[in-house]
C-alpha cells in the first residue's frame, strides 16, 4: 500500500496550505480514484480525511542527448484533514 503513495510535494504553496487549511499534497499512483486515495491515507497514516482533490499535471518532455522522451505520469492528490490531526512525513521502516 505504501507503493501507491509516491512522495509528498513540498513547495512554498503547499507549505502555506499545510498550516492554513490542513491540506497535504502528495503524488500518488495514476490509477487510484478519490475513494481509494482516502482509504489509503486513513489506513496508512491513521487520520480522518475530510476531502480529496486530485489533478493530473501535463506531461513534460525531456531530452538526454539525441534521445527524447517524457517524464512518468502521476496524479497529484491534495488531502484535507480533520481539525487537530497531522501526517508525520518521516515514517521509518525498521528492517
From Swiss-Prot:
GO cellular component: chloroplast; cytosolic large ribosomal subunit
Protein family: Belongs to the universal ribosomal protein uL23 family.
Quaternary structure, from the entry: Part of the 50S ribosomal subunit.
Gene Ontology MF term list: rRNA binding; structural constituent of ribosome
Keyword Oxidoreductase: no
Gene3D superfamilies to which the protein is assigned, alphabetical: 3.30.70.330
Compartment(s) of residence: Plastid, Chloroplast
Keyword Heme found: no
Protein name: Large ribosomal subunit protein uL23c
Principal location listed in the UniProt entry: plastid
Role noted for this protein: Binds to 23S rRNA.
GO terms for biological process, alphabetical: translation
Keyword terms of this UniProt record: Chloroplast, Plastid, Ribonucleoprotein, Ribosomal protein, RNA-binding, rRNA-binding
UniProt-listed PANTHER family: 60S RIBOSOMAL PROTEIN L23A
HAMAP family hit by this protein: Ribosomal_uL23_B (MF_01369_B)
Amino acid at each position: 500500500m505504501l507503493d501507491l503513495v509516491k512522495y509528498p510535494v513540498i513547495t512554498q504553496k503547499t507549505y502555506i496550505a499545510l498550516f492554513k487549511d490542513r491540506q497535504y499534497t502528495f503524488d500518488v499512483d495514476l490509477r487510484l480514484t478519490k475513494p481509494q486515495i482516502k482509504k489509503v491515507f486513513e489506513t496508512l497514516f491513521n487520520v480522518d480525511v475530510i476531502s480529496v482533490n486530485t489533478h493530473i499535471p501535463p506531461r513534460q518532455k525531456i531530452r538526454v542527448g539525441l534521445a527524447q522522451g517524457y517524464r512518468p505520469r502521476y496524479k497529484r492528490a491534495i488531502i484535507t484533514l480533520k481539525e487537530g490531526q497531522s501526517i508525520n512525513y518521516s515514517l521509518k521502516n525498521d528492517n
